[in-house]
């Protein structure tokens, strides 16, 4: 039904009590539905493609229907291709309900979580699964808590820069091909495309190296939010590079704007240290302090003070 890793399965605490043969039912939408209106007999609009969540209220109404022998709404509900039904609070539905659900191949699941907890966790899991995704060439690293996507042409030194950052205590998320998903509409989460080979790096002249084995598990991360893109490029003497840092560049990934820094590469430049400084500077910006603008304002203020104390004429002026 859902491709969940061990951590996600544990967080949902789901167990199937009926309809095991329907566990392969596809889930095609990330929204949830509370089937109160359907149980009351309103079928003009049925959100049948959504996971059906039964809380205490729906369970109490369900018991009332079954005690009165009113099975029509329940039977009609199961004529739709429901992906699954989940009962929260550890509630076990009555046997009659399970019997009515059996022919429809609809899995009946139970969790100990409350309805609110289940909704929040399911929405988080489903948002990650159904998030729009793109694969980009580059290296994703975490530097001082900032997720930096290092991009650039082949051979410009992306992997070598990332390797030096790892040596300096920072962490690798993915090398060569980074899978980026847009979660909740404004958060870009990056990870390796293949978990089994995600923390390997290719270094020209050295070959493939295993970062986990060489530097330990503290040198890697499974995923990280992309908070900055650093574009490495060969030094172009005819190009005017920003030397003050007052020009803020941005790039767009999956319709989300991300700060962009263009760093020219040439012999003698210590790119890893520049990236460390860029990461700390980005953190300062997020805290409301912009070094370049502060410097620019200080210079303008100094010029105004000097202008105020300057004489209106020089003694040697002649008329």
From Swiss-Prot:
UniProt-annotated binding residues for ATP: 152-159
UniProt keyword annotation of rRNA processing present: no
GO MF, any single term: protein serine/threonine kinase activity
EC number: 2.7.11.-, 2.7.4.-
Region (Important for the catalytic mechanism of dephosphorylation): 264-269
Cofactor (UniProt): Mg(2+)
Keywords in alphabetical order: ATP-binding, Kinase, Magnesium, Metal-binding, Multifunctional enzyme, Nucleotide-binding, Serine/threonine-protein kinase, Transferase
Domain of life according to the entry: Bacteria
A GO BP entry: regulation of carbohydrate metabolic process
Metal-binding found in the keyword field: yes
Pfam families according to UniProt: Hpr_kinase_C (PF07475), Hpr_kinase_N (PF02603)
Record's function text: Catalyzes the ATP- as well as the pyrophosphate-dependent phosphorylation of a specific serine residue in HPr, a phosphocarrier protein of the phosphoenolpyruvate-dependent sugar phosphotransferase system (PTS). HprK/P also catalyzes the pyrophosphate-producing, inorganic phosphate-dependent dephosphorylation (phosphorolysis) of seryl-phosphorylated HPr (P-Ser-HPr).
Note from the entry: Both phosphorylation and phosphorolysis are carried out by the same active site and suggest a common mechanism for both reactions.
Assembly description: Homohexamer.
UniProt record similarity statement: Belongs to the HPrK/P family.
Protein name (Swiss-Prot/TrEMBL): HPr kinase/phosphorylase
Gene designation per UniProt: hprK
């Amino acid at each position: 039904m859902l491709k969940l890793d061990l951590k996600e399965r544990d967080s949902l605490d789901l167990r199937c009590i009926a309809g095991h043969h329907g566990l392969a039912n596809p889930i095609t939408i990330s929204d949830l539905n509370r089937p109160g209106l359907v149980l009351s007999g309103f079928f003009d609009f049925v959100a049948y493609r959504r996971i059906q969540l039964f809380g205490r209220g729906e369970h109490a109404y369900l018991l009332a229907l079954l005690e009165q022998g009113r099975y029509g709404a329940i039977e009609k509900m199961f004529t739709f291709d429901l992906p699954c039904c989940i009962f929260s609070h550890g509630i076990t539905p009555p046997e009659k309900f399970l019997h009515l659900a059996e022919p429809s191949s609809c899995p009946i699941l139970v969790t100990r979580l409350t309805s609110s907890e289940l909704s929040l966790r399911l929405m988080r899991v489903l948002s990650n699964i159904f998030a729009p995704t793109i694969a980009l060439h580059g290296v994703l690293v975490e530097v001082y808590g900032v997720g930096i996507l290092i991009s650039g042409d082949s051979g410009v030194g992306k992997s070598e820069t990332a390797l030096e950052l790892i040596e300096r205590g920072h962490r690798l998320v993915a090398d060569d091909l980074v899978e980026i998903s847009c979660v909740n509409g404004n958060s870009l989460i990056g990870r390796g495309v293949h978990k089994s080979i995600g923390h390997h790096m290719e270094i020209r002249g050295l070959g493939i190296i295993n970062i986990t084995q060489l530097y330990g598990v503290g040198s890697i991360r499974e995923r990280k939010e992309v908070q900055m893109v650093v574009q490495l490029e060969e030094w172009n003497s005819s190009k005017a590079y920003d030397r003050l840092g007052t020009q803020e560049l941005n790039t767009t990934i999956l319709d989300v704007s991300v700060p962009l820094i263009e760093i020219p590469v040439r012999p003698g430049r210590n790119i890893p240290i520049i990236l460390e400084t860029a990461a700390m500077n980005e953190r300062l910006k997020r805290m409301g302090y912009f070094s370049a603008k502060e410097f620019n304002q200080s210079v303008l203020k100094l010029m105004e003070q000097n202008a105020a104390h300057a004489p209106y004429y020089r003694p040697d002026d002649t008329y």
